[in-house]
């Protein structure tokens, strides 16, 4: 086994050992009093019940796709697909299991100090982060070694990761938002009870949803991004460089990224900063600096120049700036969110209008930055004289952006753990000071989640672009002629798909939320003593509604993302499929940014008012902001984040089925001719 494969697998194993150590640390902490443990037990059971049901359905999907791959593409690709799917499931399961233990321990720690609570919540998130990167590089390293570096087979691993990620993100998003919308509209607006009030029948489902969507779903999303970026770099690196330096560089860089993430996590955990945001930022910046310095040394050692370093640095810097810009559009410390809060004074309509405007504005700078990142990485690598080398540079920018994924996921998954801790504190009637600490941690979590979503969409654009280049190479497409009618048809259909996908997922949340609202209203009417706190609501019924709706509604969007590219390639040929991928990439990135940022801005405008601005809780402005937040929920937590996976999944499906499209593509064209 070549040394660079050994290094990458070893780094992955170290990440998994570190995750296990953090998990053990969390388990040893106190889980609080009996009431806290009872509530946490309900949340844990609900989350695990959902995962078991989801995985049961996904097993059937994995079997069907494996058989199709084995027959039409090859058993080797099918084997890689199975491993990618299983590892994606493992990453979600490990992360969710620990997150549902860390939440109650964070609430208990908040009774003692903010620092201790932050440490536990962040450690819980770090388990997810380390599981994602550890399983990612171990899986790719093993498959690369077993199949002798044949990337045609290893792309199957990416397909497995991507398809599970889409179902996890969509299913988790529908679950969490059905519960959230139901709990908010009936609980807050109609019944006038506060958030996380134990009298609300949907409150447990809402807290389960935080884990299902924002821990397992988000983890699977970034697992897929991480794996996809490495696979695209390896695929192009194999073509461009004869002596394996094109493969060696991304694998060793990913290994260094894991070590840098571990160091960053340790710094954040030991930080003495009073502001939780500063503590989290410390680790992120340290991890980023280690990767940039290492990339310079590595680039000079492997390639004898700094070209690869500049490509990697462009990706990492663009990712960090997009994260900061996302914060500026979604944090209540900046004018965009404050404007939405101001517009809430005149009712829900102006709240919605201003939120949509913020979402649209927020597409400008990320797209400009992604474009700069693409240009820099393409030309600095030598794309002017050799296009394939330039495209390899773009894939390195994606690897650079995702090199500290372990840290990104840790910071991102910390948010829902802190949110859950606040819910447990409220339901357990812990002192007001505890809720103040968890609220502070949660508000930082909202910002980190928004930054994470910005990072995810930026990396999705670069990863999909480099996978698209791999597809063009696999199907022997020299260029895509947009004056070609067939390509134009593909472009139109591709550009439409993110809107159709968004409509399906938004409608699914609406349907599921409707069921939830009816159930919560029924319980308020038919169970005497709920409002007085004398009777316990039927929490399980609401959990079951969310689970059933999420599983039912995730199937169509998921199947669509896989079937449409294959159908397009078979019916209209490789040029039309190339057009479809380009159209979906452009519109998917824009729709994803708009939805994620508009939703985040509405959410924080509501929190800004709850902090005392514009009349505070219970005011007319607050009621309007709650409506905005409710509309924004499926925007930012279901449809928006799903766009990243959609564009990457369609590209990797096309790459895996490229041999089939090359052999049988254009059936309809041949009939017409």
Curated annotation (Swiss-Prot):
Keywords: Calcium, Cell membrane, Ion transport, Magnesium, Membrane, Metal-binding, Potassium, Sodium, Sodium transport, Translocase, Transmembrane, Transmembrane helix, Transport. It is found in: Cell membrane. The keyword Lipid metabolism does not apply. GO terms for biological process: sodium ion transport. Substrate binds at residues 177, 636. InterPro entries: PPase-energised_H-pump. The record marks 449 as: Determinant of potassium dependence. Signal peptide: none annotated. Mg(2+) 2 binds at residues 207, 210, 419. Its main location: membrane. The chain crosses the membrane at residues 3-23, 62-82, 84-104, 127-147, 154-174, 222-242, 247-267, 279-299, 302-322, 364-384, 387-407, 449-469, 486-506, 553-573, 576-596, 652-672. Requires K(+) for maximal activity. Sodium pump that utilizes the energy of pyrophosphate hydrolysis as the driving force for Na(+) movement across the membrane. Homodimer. HAMAP family: PPase_energized_pump (MF_01129). This is Putative K(+)-stimulated pyrophosphate-energized sodium pump. The lineage of its organism: Bacteria, Bacillati, Bacillota, Clostridia, Eubacteriales.
